[in-house]
């Protein structure tokens, strides 16, 4: 029984900070299964239905909803109540005619932003790296564990617009000075600003970015910057009406 608990459940006080749960109500909570997002960067699908949307009173009701294929993540029906849902995933529930994009609030917690139908056909994915594979082709290594073969036109840090569920590239946003960046970590999390300068280091230290916002400028790590557009964001963000 102890082993089962360690695999499928997690003590609430050990739950990642981004989980929207009360850690003192009960001892255990559901643990995410292996999937596209790491434990500390995701929440289980059951938590989305029960704790965030309130569509299920308990895990049993959430499992019934999922077993009926009533919930799609990035356009694919998901029945596993422990399936990990993370940043920029698109969650659709056709029976209630609602679609949401997973974002972060100003405390770093995962939240759902309801989106219009026209915005539900794509998701944004950041390029973490590039690999040359057999035949000289370029493989893009993306957030969420995805790898896709594409032209060598993209750079690490660029963000792709992927059609879902096909996962085909429809457009891209370059990680460059002048672009709009959403901050995904550090004390400025969830703030949006313009990239003023990208500072490349020639040592083991991380690259940094100087961001400009209406409130002023700040320096952040390059890995915390998720570009979301040029003149304006291509998606609705936290705080937008």
From Swiss-Prot:
GO BP annotations of the record are: translation
Please provide, in alphabetical order, the Gene Ontology terms of the cellular component aspect for this entry.
cytosolic small ribosomal subunit
Question: Pfam families from the xrefs?
Answer: Ribosomal_S4e, RS4NT
For this UniProt record, give its keywords in alphabetical order, as a comma-separated list. Ribonucleoprotein, Ribosomal protein, RNA-binding, rRNA-binding
InterPro entries given for it?
A: Rib_uL2_dom2 (IPR014722), Ribosomal_eS4 (IPR000876), Ribosomal_eS4_central_region (IPR013845), Ribosomal_eS4_central_sf (IPR038237), Ribosomal_eS4_KOW (IPR041982), Ribosomal_eS4_N (IPR013843), Ribosomal_eS4_N_CS (IPR018199), S4_RNA-bd_sf (IPR036986)
HAMAP family cross-referenced by the UniProt entry: Ribosomal_eS4
User: What is the protein name stated in its UniProt record?
Assistant: Small ribosomal subunit protein eS4
The species this protein belongs to is Methanosphaera stadtmanae (strain ATCC 43021 / DSM 3091 / JCM 11832 / MCB-3)
Q: Which gene encodes it?
A: rps4e
